[in-house]
């Protein structure tokens, strides 16, 4: 399977909320960097936790891959848009049943044996908060937890 096909499969699993299938695609020591959250660590822990929360909060999540290319070192770089309607608290933002869309950039490092060894994701966290109806980040009543 090519790095491109692997990335397409990865984002299909993200859209379907199939975290266990994603974990089956990564190496045992795969890392994740969710840059907007300043969360860096093992994919099996930090990545899985984020993806499970995303799937729970947005059961109707859609992932549209807008651009996808593979570099010479077999890194798949994808520009995606995610959208859905919030159905549960997400990243400490109380559920207001807001529909949102968010552009993201993801980098998946693919090994020669077609496994993902590193995931890096970027997005504008303030844009995410605005889309979910957070007007002021200093008003605790808007956020849960």
Summary of predicted features, one role per range:
Residues 1, 5, 41-45, 95-96:
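Residues at secondary-structure transition points
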Residues 2, 55-145:
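A beta-strand edge to alpha-helix "cap/lid" segment located at domain peripheries
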């Amino acid at each position: 399977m090519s790095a491109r096909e692997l990335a397409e499969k990865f984002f299909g699993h993200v859209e379907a909320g199939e975290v266990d299938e994603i974990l089956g695609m990564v190496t045992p020591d795969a890392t994740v960097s969710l840059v907007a959250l300043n969360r860096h660590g093992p994919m099996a822990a930090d990545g899985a936790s984020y993806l499970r929360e995303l799937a729970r909060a947005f059961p109707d999540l859609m992932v549209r891959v807008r651009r996808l290319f593979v570099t010479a070192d077999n890194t798949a770089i994808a520009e995606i848009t995610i959208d859905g309607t919030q159905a549960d608290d997400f990243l400490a933002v109380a559920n207001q049943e807001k529909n949102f869309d968010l552009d993201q950039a993801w980098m998946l490092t693919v090994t020669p044996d077609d496994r993902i060894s590193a995931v890096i994701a970027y997005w504008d966290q303030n844009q995410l908060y605005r889309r979910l109806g957070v007007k002021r980040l200093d008003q605790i009543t808007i956020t849960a937890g």
